[in-house]
């Protein structure tokens, strides 16, 4: 990605940056931000979806449950992780781990980076829509602090299933939308080649979503994008997580849950 392109930072350029194959993924951030991480597997029903990483982590002697949608770092790993498109068993694994966090009173940190939930026949047969809907229902009432960070693409319900949280953050050049610009252009204008125009109309950038109060904060990226200095980006995310937890530390559970509920109930008033 050229320096000139980064400087332009219009919506379509941000789409390109968010999709950059060299952009740090969830696995990288987990390894860089947390002192220790033990990965847990499976949804206890069908199998283990490699598109979602989850487990228990330590940071500054505090325990967390960390769950994230992960793209691959190369073609082989992308195939293994289904290019960051989770199956229903992935969302059920995520929910299993978050309910476990509730039981043991661990805060939950979610990383979101997906073009969307996988829409194959098998995924539909195993209840993709139900799995996503169940996550939305459960997360709105989960009795622990929840932080969600969009680190690249935040595509549709597949992203939202890990993004109902007390604090929702986006990296500076990430995107978050109901569907891809290509999909939007194809459906509304019957012309996928108008994706660049669609990206601007859709208001999918972190700056747009902060203005509408859909998200709580934009995390600044290093000059040139997160992939130019991944370590610095991880440090920025770590600092933001710790600051957010500090803000929520003195909040009693009832207040936390009421504020989370009202946050989503009142979104329409900001549009």
UniProtKB/Swiss-Prot annotation:
Q: Which UniProt keywords apply?
A: ATP-binding, Cytoplasm, Fatty acid biosynthesis, Fatty acid metabolism, Lipid biosynthesis, Lipid metabolism, Nucleotide-binding, Transferase
Q: What is its main location?
A: cytoplasm
**Catalysed conversion reaction:** N(6)-carboxybiotinyl-L-lysyl-[protein] + acetyl-CoA = N(6)-biotinyl-L-lysyl-[protein] + malonyl-CoA
State the disulfide connectivity.
Answer: none
Q: Which Gene3D superfamilies match?
A: 2-enoyl-CoA Hydratase, Chain A, domain 1
Q: Is ATP-binding among the key words of this record?
A: yes
Pfam families documented for this protein: ACCA (PF03255)
Q: What is its EC number?
A: 2.1.3.15
CoA carboxyltransferase C-terminal domain location = 1-247
Q: Is Lipid metabolism set as a keyword in this record? A: yes
The entry's function note states: Component of the acetyl coenzyme A carboxylase (ACC) complex. First, biotin carboxylase catalyzes the carboxylation of biotin on its carrier protein (BCCP) and then the CO(2) group is transferred by the carboxyltransferase to acetyl-CoA to form malonyl-CoA.
PANTHER family with a match to the protein in the record = ACETYL-COENZYME A CARBOXYLASE CARBOXYL TRANSFERASE SUBUNIT ALPHA (PTHR42853), ACETYL-COENZYME A CARBOXYLASE CARBOXYL TRANSFERASE SUBUNIT ALPHA, CHLOROPLASTIC (PTHR42853:SF3)
Give the protein's recorded name.
Answer: Acetyl-coenzyme A carboxylase carboxyl transferase subunit alpha
Q: Which organism is it from?
A: Clostridium perfringens (strain SM101 / Type A)
């Amino acid at each position: 990605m050229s320096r000139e392109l980064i400087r332009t930072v219009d919506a379509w350029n941000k789409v390109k940056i968010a999709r950059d194959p060299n952009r740090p993924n969830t696995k990288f951030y987990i390894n860089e931000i947390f002192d220790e991480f033990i990965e847990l597997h499976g949804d206890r029903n069908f199998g283990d979806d490699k598109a979602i990483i989850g487990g228990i982590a330590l940071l500054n002697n505090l325990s967390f449950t960390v769950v994230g949608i992960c793209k691959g770092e190369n073609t082989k790993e992308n195939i293994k992780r289904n290019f960051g498109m989770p199956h229903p068993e992935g969302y059920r694994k995520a929910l299993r781990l978050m309910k476990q966090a509730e039981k043991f009173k661990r805060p939950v940190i979610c990383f979101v980076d997906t073009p969307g939930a996988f829409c194959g026949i098998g995924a539909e047969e195993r209840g993709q829509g139900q799995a996503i809907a169940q996550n939305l229902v459960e997360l709105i009432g989960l009795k622990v602090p929840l932080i969600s960070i969009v680190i690249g693409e935040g595509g549709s319900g597949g992203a939202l299933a890990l993004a109902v949280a007390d604090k929702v953050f986006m990296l500076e050049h990430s995107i978050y939308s109901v569907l891809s610009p290509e999909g939007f252009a194809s459906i509304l204008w019957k012309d996928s080649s108008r994706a660049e125009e669609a990206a601007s109309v859709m208001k999918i950038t972190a700056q747009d979503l902060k203005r509408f109060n859909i998200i709580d904060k934009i995390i600044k990226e290093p000059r040139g994008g997160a992939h130019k200095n991944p370590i610095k980006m991880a440090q920025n995310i770590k600092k933001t997580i710790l600051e957010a937890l500090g803000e929520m530390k003195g909040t009693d559970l009832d207040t936390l849950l009421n504020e989370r509920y009202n946050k989503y109930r009142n979104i329409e008033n900001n549009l």
